[in-house]
Amino acid sequence: MAKQKIRIRLKAYDHKILDQSAEKIVDTAKRSGANVSGPIPLPTEKAVYTILRAVHKYKDSREQFEMRTHKRLIDILNPTPQTVDALMRLDLPSGVDIEIKL
């Protein structure tokens, strides 16, 4: 698998478990002999939802909720077969969404 690149994109609502997962991936890839670039922090998406506090009237009284999606990018350059095998066996938290591109 020479001259290839694996791009891993991580998404999560909690930045702490996201950073822990990224550190696990980087550590696993480095131990198996691959070159690693990252984790690179990508812009955080912020979704804001505004709702009325009252049911019928009082339109001026509103409440806002927000949902932040944190993202990280990891590039693994020149992965070995051991790298791919180790990444497949890696156990990550359920709150982290992983997208892998070869």
Curated annotation (Swiss-Prot):
Keywords in alphabetical order: Ribonucleoprotein, Ribosomal protein
One Gene Ontology term from the biological process aspect of the record: translation
Pfam families found in the cross-reference section: Ribosomal_S10 (PF00338)
InterPro entries referenced in this protein's UniProt entry, alphabetically: Ribosomal_uS10 (IPR001848), Ribosomal_uS10_CS (IPR018268), Ribosomal_uS10_dom (IPR027486), Ribosomal_uS10_dom_sf (IPR036838)
Record's GO cellular component terms: ribonucleoprotein complex; ribosome
GO MF annotation list: structural constituent of ribosome; tRNA binding
Stored SMART domains: Ribosomal_S10
Domain of life according to the entry: Bacteria
Self-association and partners: Part of the 30S ribosomal subunit.
Family statement: Belongs to the universal ribosomal protein uS10 family.
Function recorded in the entry: Involved in the binding of tRNA to the ribosomes.
Protein name, UniProt field: Small ribosomal subunit protein uS10
